[in-house]
Amino acid sequence: MGTGYHAAVMARVKPGDIVAVVGDGAVGLCGVIAAKMLGAKRIILMSRHDDRQALGREFGATDVIPERGEAGEANVKALTDEGVGVDAVLECVGSDASMQTAINIARPGATVGTVGIPHNVTIPFEKIFFGTVGIHGGPAPTRAYAPLLLDAVLKGDINPGRVFTYATTLDNINEAYQKMDQRQAIKSLLKISEV
């Protein structure tokens, strides 16, 4: 939850914003929760997986775009005021394609909050310079967000634990990773011991 919240903070999400979340893993889904917490009026989740789309909607996504590339970008922009793009983008993947999408759907003056660990990402400096798109991000300072987020969980305002769709013991850690890799689990929960 802390990393998804960090993406929203880095994207400078504020009340009334139209926000896009690129990535439907646990971090992206928690980014949906965070955008809602920060007052976004419209939250667009880019997701190709039915189970994640459903959970994203339950978490607060108002729209889901399953397409990628230019078609996905066009569909996101079609949901914005005059098609100019979103106010804030949460980039929660770390691939070059996801970063390019994030930049392409951002309106002039928007901010991309990136928390996906970058893998061969190229930043098109001229595009962000002339498009006046800001990029902020990095590792999440989760301890800084813990009091706020834990309070929201304990009050029942949010339930990010729903991203754990598979539970097993430490002895089956390889299976836990395989299930996530094969998109059979959003996030695996490892039980060290039964309490």
Predicted regions and their residues:
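Adenosine-nucleotide cofactor-binding segment
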Residues: 21-24, 36-101
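Rossmann-fold NAD(P)-binding glycine/threonine-rich loop
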Residues: 116-132, 144, 148-151
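Short internal alpha-helix immediately C-terminal to a glycine-rich phosphate-binding loop
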Residues: 1-38, 78
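Generic hydrophobic/aromatic pocket-lining and core-packing "Φ" positions
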Residues: 8, 32, 53, 99-103, ...
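Residues in the short beta-alpha loop(s) of Rossmann-like NAD(P)-binding domains
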Residues: 48-49, 118, 141
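C-terminal hydrophobic helical "lid"/dimerization subdomain
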Residues: 100-104, 143-195
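ADP-ribose/adenylate-binding Rossmann-like module
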Residues: 104-120, 135-136
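A generic alpha-to-beta junction signature in SAM-dependent methyltransferases
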Residues: 11-13, 80, 93, 106-107
